[in-house]
C-alpha cells in the first residue's frame, strides 16, 4: 500500500477504456524490456471484443498530465526552497525536507521531456481484467517508464481490486507465475512478492497440460524458440 500511496503524488487519473491499441503499445514495451513475447494486436482485440459481448472484460488505464504535474512540482519545490532559506524548517525535519526536494527535482527531470506534448494526458499503464458472474482475474498489463516511476502499475491493480470489491465478486485473482515463488529465475520471485503484498493468499493450482494436435510441430517448436531467443540476444 505504501507504493499505491506514492502514486497519489502524481495525481493519476484511473479510467476504464476500450483502447486496445494503446494497451498493445504498452505491453510491447514490457515485452522488449523483460524478454517475453507479447501477442499481436489482433489477438488482444479479438479477445477483448469476444469478452465484451458478455460484459466480462474491463481495461483500467492510468493517465498522467505532465503539464499540470510539472507546474505543481515547480510550485512545491519553490515553496520548500524558500522555507529553507527563511529558516522555517525545524532541524528534526530538515533531512526529510531535503529528501523531498531531491524527489521533486527528479520528478522534474523525468517529466520535462513530456511537457507541452500531452494536453489531454498520457496513458502510462493499462490493465486488462476478465470476469465471470462471481469472480475477477487480472490478465495482461503494460506500462512505460512513467508508469514505473509513478507507481501506476500498483495503482491499476489496486483500482481493479477495489472495483471487484465494489461489485461484490467472490474473489479477485492476481494470477501468478509458474513454479516456486522463491525461484531465482528472471524476476519471477519478485513478481510473486509484488502480488503477495496486496494481501492475498498464495494458491498453487494443478497446472497446465498441452493438448497436442500437431505432434511434429510440437517437437520442433521448442528448438525454434531456443534459436529465436538466441538470435534476439
Could you describe each region identified by the protein language model?
Residues 119, 124-126, 130-198:
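Acyl-donor binding region in acyl/amide transferases
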Residues 43, 47, 64, 68, ...:
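Solvent-exposed, non-transmembrane amphipathic alpha-helical segments
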Residues 1-148, 163:
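A conserved beta-strand-loop-helix scaffold within acyl/acetyltransferase catalytic domains
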Residues 170-233:
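Active-site/acyl-donor-binding loops of N-acyltransferases
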Residues 38, 42, 59, 153, ...:
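Residue-level detector of alpha-helical recognition elements and their boundaries
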Residues 13-16, 44-47, 91-92, 157-161, ...:
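Short C-terminal domain-edge/linker segments immediately following a structured domain
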